Amino acid sequence: DFFFGVGSLVFGVLALTFSFGGGDTLEAEVSAFTLAWRRGDQAATDSALGALAGAAVEPMAMEAQPEAATGYLFCRARTRLFAPIFWFVALGPVGAVGYRLSVLARAFGETHDNAGPDYCQAASRWLGWLDFVPDRLMALALALAGHFSAAWQAWEQTRSEPANRRLSETGIGALGLPVDEGPRDLTIATLDDAHALLRRALYLWIALVAIGSLFGLG
């Protein structure tokens, strides 16, 4: 029993680590973008912005990049932290690994032309289903950790928007900023604030998921 318990623990840790994805941490990605933006390095900020987006992005003016980076950060945190933890609690290591494989399957479709549109649509739709509950719990945690009324208003106003935009606008709303109805001229300080908000929300979110597991989710 002892060795089985140790083996299960090791497997769980490895599965959770895998589900968080490889490469740099979110903190490192934010730091890379911030440093590049402050020294005015267009090529480096484009690369760092793509890392936060998890995919190649269209070139944009440096003045617009902090707002884009802030939106990408919320979605990146969902994919690399919040959703894997949720599925680990809900279904154990299999759930966390399954979620990560679903993320990789979608990425494969986005980067390989021979995957075909049907594959890409199916992979995106499947991942959207897996993100449905984590998105809502994460939005709640962001609202509780930040400006609740502004976050709630953003969530309601973007009801008909794609899931990623809805989540990012809710996160920006939790910072006390309005829904994007025009240029907001967000600064690099907003990205730092978003990163701090995510840390607070993560602690709250883990507590929410743990409470949910007591009622049959885990």
Where are the regions a protein language model picked out?
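Hydrophobic N-terminal alpha-helices or hydrophobic patches in metabolic proteins across all domains
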Residues: 1-218
